Structures are given as structure tokens and as C-alpha cells.
Amino acid sequence: MTITEEDLIEPLRKVVEYSPPRRFLETVDMIVNVKGVDLSDPSQRIDKEVVLPHGRGKPVNVCVIAEGEMAREAEEAGATVINREKLEELAENVREAKKIARRHEFFYAQVDLMPDVGRVLGPVLGPRGKMAKPVPPNADIRALIERAHRTARVRMRDQPVIHTVIGARNMEPEQLAENAMAVLREITSELEKSWAQIDSVYVKTTMGPAERVY
């Protein structure tokens, strides 16, 4: 059995309309329980990024480790920028490095700074699955940052469960359903038996109750 956008719309409508109002814009999340995977085999652990058709619905924190023109463009695009000097300061301040790792969803680094990024931030970014992606000198850092604002991380850790964002509460259920389907298609494409390995699917707002889809 597969899930369609139509299957998702009503559960999404319920979680958006009936969850108690909050003082902040909640995200809408999807929880996918998978069966028949051997997590001791790294090749069976899903770790992907999915560009959502309608975006995340709210900004995401992006950190760029760079200098010069790339740093300037990244800052203008709204990213947090760490230069070489700040990076070396973080080498002596693990607490601050961990705080930066927690607060940011995506990390990019000027390619020639990657060895230093690995040395200083690798220990805090690696376990979180957030290791910085190298950016060559001719790359459009603005485009990468813009893409990050439309991207969901789809990652399976120590349990056969994927918990990911599919949008924000102020989005239409139909938009959220399209985003959810993009994520589900990516997940099932990584599974040997595709939809047969999907055990259950739930949707919820950040602080609201979960609604079962499948």
C-alpha cells in the first residue's frame, strides 16, 4: 500500500486547525517509522536532504564559514558568518561551538577552510549529521543559502524512525501534503522494499498532538 497526497490532506488539516494556538509559528513535522532495516549496517541508515516543493514556511538558520567576498555575500543573504579568526577562537571554546551547532541547521564552508573546519567544528557537527559542505570559490553561496531555506533533513539515527519538518503551520494543508510526499518518495526510494517497509506515518505541529496518516 502507498500513501497519496489525498491521504495526507485531512490529517494535516486536523493538526493545523485543532492544535492549540501558540505564541510562535510552529513547524509541521512528519514522523515515519520504518521496518526491516538493519541499523548496524551504515548503508541502511537514511541520511538525505529533500528540497520541499513549497519550502519550509519559515526561515532556517544557516552558518557559513568563509572570508572575503563569500563571507560578505553570505552575510547579506542572512547567514551567520564565521571567519578564520572566529573559527580559531571556537577551538578554545567548545561550549560556544556546541551552541552554534545546535542553533544552525545547515553549514557551508569555503573549500580552503575545510581542514580547519574539520579540526575545530568536526567533533560537534559530525555527531549531529551537520558537517559543513565545502563551497568552491566560483559557487553561488546565495543560491545555496536560499536552497537551504527550502530543504528538509531526512535522517535515521539510532532508531528506525525519521522525524523531519514538512512546513509551517501557516501553510495550506495541500502544500504541506505535497511537501510530505516529496519526503516520502525520497525515503521509499532508499528502502529495498519501498513502501512495504513503511510501518506508520504521523504528522504533528511542534507542540501539538500527533495524527496518524498510515
Curated annotation (Swiss-Prot):
Q: Which InterPro entries match?
A: Ribosomal_uL1, Ribosomal_uL1-like, Ribosomal_uL1/biogenesis, Ribosomal_uL1_3-a/b-sand, Ribosomal_uL1_arc
Q: How does it assemble?
A: Part of the 50S ribosomal subunit.
GO CC list: large ribosomal subunit
CDD domains associated with the record:
Ribosomal_L1 (cd00403)
Pfam families in the cross-refs: Ribosomal_L1
Annotated family: Belongs to the universal ribosomal protein uL1 family.
Role, per record: Binds directly to 23S rRNA. Probably involved in E site tRNA release. Protein L1 is also a translational repressor protein, it controls the translation of its operon by binding to its mRNA.
Q: Does the keyword Ribosomal protein apply?
A: yes
Instruction: Give GO BP annotations, semicolon-separated.
Output: regulation of translation; translation
Q: What is this protein called?
A: Large ribosomal subunit protein uL1
The alphabetical list of record keywords is:
Repressor, Ribonucleoprotein, Ribosomal protein, RNA-binding, rRNA-binding, Translation regulation, tRNA-binding
Q: Supply one GO molecular-function term.
A: rRNA binding
Q: Does Cytoplasm count among this protein's keywords?
A: no
